[in-house]
């Protein structure tokens, strides 16, 4: 069934491209139908795990000793199901957006989701590195295609460069663990401490926690539709890796670094998420805040359960807040519920996190971290209220079917989040309810404080927060990178034109000699 789901996503993208000359309504209907089928297939996979799909080892075996390996288990299923839910919600709400997506963009929806699901299913570091690299390459091509200014191209290249560093660290960690006598599986404990550090650093870099960076470039055409996938899927894939690492157990030596990354990201992400009024521009800070919460709940003794819940919350509540536009008073319900989930409402992923923090507090474990995390949860919920208080905008269409599918698109992630929360943990504990109440009190106090705050003071705080921005550093790094690109371009000119044929024969000659020597 995982192969059936992946095949359906591939067929959907191809079908949309074939129908590119058809009416927009037809393309949307086909996209919605395929997304619904993928969502149902993802739901049925709950009855199919655990399952492992193994491909043959690449040749030569002395160079590629790890096969491509996919694993369907509790962790991969819930991330997979959340991703298909985000895809379905994004397509359902697309009918009510004034911007019309082209057939190429619609096909990209399905191809990109398929790559993200492959990364979730990856059971070893080789498979994960390949899927990460494919996602990064596909994203870079799309960003460069949409970039309208040189600055946009510059930001896209640096974002891809940061992600590529994560891929290289992942491969380096796999190599060190292999040299120490271990394997490349992410379901068994690591042998090399250095390998663990590098793999964790790869995940933290792609999450934007170490060093701090603020996600993908913000292009105007990517506000709510495709931008939701590009903002949420890469960090969710990294959180899935982090979940695996907590499942197999982490050395004590890694805890101080993870704690530093979690607290720093929670402070910066939480404050920026509150102060930024536009929910679309503030999405990177939402991702940073939830990712930091995942790290902190994992360190509090909760292990993989809390990280898994945070990853699902990132996908589902992030989709609701990213896709929501207020057209009627009824549309405000779903951002409000999302805010309650973020502060730990029972029977939700946030409630699971609240319960785990409550248990840690009762047992006297990491009290300071627990208090910081509860305040961070309050900040996440408070920032989500920006969407709740947005001004109403008129419907772009008068069709009742469009309004119905839009409402369903906002409701589905929230309802799935509640269902997943009940599936994870049926009964909320008293300590979890206390944490939820505490986060609600902190959030209420913060709301009253911000309401009484003069506008000039809020703008001053916003200006101070804007100084924590990595873009000036990126601009400084752009100059040596551009010089390197010129060198590469001049070297590449040797291979152009009539000289290309000669160089091709030289390369073939070296290959023949190498094979003969082997």
Map each language-model feature to its residues.
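Aromatic-capped, Gly/Pro-kinked transmembrane alpha-helices
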Residues: 426-433, 453-518
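Interfacial segments of multi-pass membrane proteins
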Residues: 294-301, 355-370
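Alpha-helical multi-pass transmembrane bundles of energy-transducing inner-membrane proteins
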Residues: 22-27, 107-194, 205-208, 273-335, ...
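Short helix-boundary/re-entrant hairpin motifs in multi-pass inner-membrane proteins
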Residues: 54, 61, 90, 197-257, ...
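Short aromatic-rich membrane-water interface segments that cap or initiate transmembrane helices
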Residues: 62-78, 191-196, 362-370
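Transmembrane helix-loop-helix hairpins at membrane boundaries of multipass inner-membrane proteins
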Residues: 1-4, 8, 12-99, 103-107, ...
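Predominantly late transmembrane helices and immediately cytosolic-facing juxtamembrane segments
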Residues: 213, 310-334, 364-411, 439-466
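Hydrophobic membrane-spanning alpha-helices of multi-pass integral membrane proteins
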Residues: 335-344, 375-381, 401-421, 471-486, ...
């Amino acid at each position: 069934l995982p192969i059936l789901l992946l095949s359906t996503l591939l067929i959907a993208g191809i079908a949309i491209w074939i129908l590119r000359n058809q009416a927009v309504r037809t393309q949307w209907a086909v996209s919605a139908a395929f997304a619904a089928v993928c969502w149902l297939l993802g739901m049925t996979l709950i009855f199919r795990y655990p399952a492992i799909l193994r491909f043959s080892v690449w040749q030569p075996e002395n160079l590629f000793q790890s096969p491509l390996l996919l694993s369907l288990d509790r962790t991969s299923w819930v991330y997979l199901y959340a991703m298909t839910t985000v895809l379905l919600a994004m397509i359902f709400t697309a009918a009510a957006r004034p911007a019309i997506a082209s057939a190429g963009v619609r096909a990209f929806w399905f191809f990109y989701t398929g790559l993200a699901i492959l990364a979730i299913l990856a059971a070893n570091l080789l498979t994960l590195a390949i899927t990460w690299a494919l996602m990064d390459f596909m994203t870079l091509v799309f960003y460069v295609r949409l970039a309208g200014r040189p600055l946009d191209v510059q930001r896209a290249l640096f974002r891809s460069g940061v992600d590529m560093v994560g891929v290289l660290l992942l491969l380096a960690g796999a190599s060190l663990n292999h040299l120490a006598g271990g394997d490349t599986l992410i379901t068994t404990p690591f042998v090399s401490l250095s390998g663990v550090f590098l793999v964790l650093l790869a995940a933290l870099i792609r999450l934007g926690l170490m060093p701090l960076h603020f996600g993908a470039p913000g292009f105007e055409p990517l506000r709510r539709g495709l931008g939701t996938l590009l903002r949420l899927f890469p960090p969710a894939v990294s959180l899935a890796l982090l979940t695996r690492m907590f499942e197999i157990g982490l050395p004590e030596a890694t805890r101080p670094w993870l704690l530093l990354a979690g607290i720093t990201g929670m402070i910066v992400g939480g404050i920026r998420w509150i102060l930024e009024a536009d929910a679309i521009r503030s999405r990177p800070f939402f991702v940073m805040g939830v990712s930091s919460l995942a790290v902190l709940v994992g360190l509090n003794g909760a292990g993989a359960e809390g990280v898994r819940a945070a990853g699902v919350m990132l996908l589902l509540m992030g989709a609701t807040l990213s896709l929501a536009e207020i057209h009627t008073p009824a549309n405000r319900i779903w951002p409000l519920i999302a805010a309650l989930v973020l502060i730990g409402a029972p029977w939700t992923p946030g409630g699971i996190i609240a319960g785990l923090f409550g248990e840690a507090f009762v047992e006297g474990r990491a009290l300071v971290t627990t208090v910081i995390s509860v305040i961070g949860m309050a900040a996440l919920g408070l920032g989500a209220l920006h969407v709740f208080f947005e001004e109403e905008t008129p419907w772009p269409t008068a069709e009742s079917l469009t309004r119905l599918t839009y409402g369903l698109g906002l409701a589905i992630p929230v309802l799935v989040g509640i269902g997943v929360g009940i599936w994870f943990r049926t009964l909320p504990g008293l300590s979890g309810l206390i944490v939820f109440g505490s986060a609600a009190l902190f959030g209420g106090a913060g709301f009253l404080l911000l309401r009484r705050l003069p506008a000039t003071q809020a703008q001053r705080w916003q200006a101070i927060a804007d100084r924590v921005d990595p873009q000036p550093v990126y601009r400084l790094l752009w100059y040596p990178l551009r010089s390197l690109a010129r060198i590469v371009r001049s070297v590449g000119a040797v291979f152009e034109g009539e000289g290309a044929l000669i160089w091709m024969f030289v390369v073939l000659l070296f290959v023949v000699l190498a094979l003969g020597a082997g």
